[in-house]
């Protein structure tokens, strides 16, 4: 049995260009220099090589050498391009580079890893940070820090001081809810909400809801007197209607022939139902206490003005005077319309 003599053994050398791919916990894409071992030094191990080269990397930034697996075209002994170095973190926030790029956990080919920064919660101020993640076939690509397969939802709220606050969170469906309140012509309780939702087809639906404290004033229902007198033709007069004008309206209305009618003797007319005529006149003037005695006093006022005169021979019979414009009246005796008189 031959004994191994350490003094006679040739020094062990690390082969040049070795990537040490078999070392677990380190993925180094650069070459190691040839290290000559002393005669009394045992075989070089990964720990010895690590200690020998880690001091030379102190001046370099923390690089994600594990992401080099996504670039199969890079040769084993080639130095990585300084412009295509995949930095993990936000370029504007160097604090995000604290991610341990020398992690011992092995990485597998798949989706790009998430950035080290925390995912911005809904309601946080400012825009969400961006991460530079290497993609196969490209140098770098920028993407927002969000979970794979999920969408981003933005919430907009307007505070009492008028400032607008935007926040992003993770949700199943993109949504944007914006509620604005103001005190305008519609009152302080007027609120308008917009809810535009994004559907899978790329279409946008906008829903607007508006509530107001305004009260709607309904039109007052017409009085019974106006409804009953709406069928009467109006005479051409200005100002408030007078009694003789109202009597002409009733005479021109065939539906009122039971209470007032022409006698056929020139401009003479007769009150067949004086109480009904007085009631209609009271409804028109909004005087519910109107009666025939008050109406007759108004007719006597027209006597000396030659507008209405008392016609003798019949009770409740009157005649229009010469001051009344020419009018046509039906000739009851002849069954037709009489001639115009002055």
UniProtKB/Swiss-Prot annotation:
Keyword presence, DNA-binding: yes
Gene3D superfamilies documented for this protein: Winged helix-like DNA-binding domain superfamily/Winged helix DNA-binding domain (1.10.10.10)
GO MF term (any one): DNA-binding transcription factor activity, RNA polymerase II-specific
Location of the protein in the cell: Nucleus
Sections of the chain in a coiled coil: none
Top-level taxon of origin: Eukaryota
InterPro entries attached to this UniProt entry: Ets_dom (IPR000418), ETS_fam (IPR046328), WH-like_DNA-bd_sf (IPR036388), WH_DNA-bd_sf (IPR036390)
Record Pfam families: Ets
GO biological process: one example: BMP signaling pathway
Alphabetical keyword list: DNA-binding, Nucleus
SUPFAM superfamilies the record matches: Winged helix' DNA-binding domain
DNA-binding region positions on the chain: 240-320
GO cellular component: nucleus
PROSITE patterns, alphabetized: ETS_DOMAIN_1, ETS_DOMAIN_2, ETS_DOMAIN_3
Function: Binds to DNA sequences containing the consensus pentanucleotide 5'-CGGA[AT]-3'.
Recorded family membership: Belongs to the ETS family.
Protein name listed in UniProt: ETS translocation variant 2
Species this protein is from: Homo sapiens
Taxonomic path: Eukaryota, Metazoa, Chordata, Craniata, Vertebrata
């Amino acid at each position: 049995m031959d004994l191994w003599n350490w003094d006679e053994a040739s020094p062990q050398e690390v082969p040049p260009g070795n990537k040490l791919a078999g070392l677990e916990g380190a993925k180094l894409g650069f070459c190691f220099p040839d290290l000559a071992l002393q005669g009394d030094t045992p075989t070089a191990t990964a720990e010895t090589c690590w200690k020998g080269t880690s001091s030379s990397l102190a001046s370099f930034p923390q690089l994600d050498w594990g992401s080099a697996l996504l670039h199969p075209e890079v040769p084993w002994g080639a130095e990585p391009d300084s412009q295509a170095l995949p930095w993990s973190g936000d370029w504007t926030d160097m604090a995000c580079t604290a991610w341990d790029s020398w992690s011992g956990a092995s990485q597998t080919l798949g989706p790009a890893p998430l950035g080290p920064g925390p995912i911005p919660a809904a309601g946080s101020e400012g825009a969400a940070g961006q991460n530079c993640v290497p993609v196969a076939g490209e140098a770098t690509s920028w993407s927002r820090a969000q979970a794979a397969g999920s969408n981003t939802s933005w919430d907009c709220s307007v505070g009492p001081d008028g400032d607008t606050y935007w926040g992003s969170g993770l949700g199943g469906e993109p949504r944007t809810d914006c509620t604005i309140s103001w005190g305008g012509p519609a009152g302080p309780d007027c609120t308008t909400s917009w809810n535009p939702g994004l559907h899978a087809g790329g279409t946008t639906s906008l829903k607007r809801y508006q509530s107001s404290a305004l009260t709607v004033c309904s039109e007052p229902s017409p009085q019974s007197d106006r409804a009953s007198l709406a069928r009467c033709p109006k005479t051409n007069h200005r100002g408030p209607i007078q009694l003789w004008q109202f009597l002409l309206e009733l005479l021109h209305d065939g539906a009122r022939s039971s209470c007032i009618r022409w006698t056929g003797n020139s401009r003479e007319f007769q009150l067949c139902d004086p109480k009904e005529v007085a009631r209609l006149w009271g409804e028109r003037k909004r005087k519910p206490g109107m009666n025939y005695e008050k109406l007759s006093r108004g007719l006597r006022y027209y006597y000396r003005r030659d507008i209405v005169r008392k016609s003798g021979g019949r009770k409740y019979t009157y005649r229009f005077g010469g001051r009344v414009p020419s009018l046509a009246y039906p000739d009851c005796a002849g069954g037709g319309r009489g001639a115009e008189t002055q």
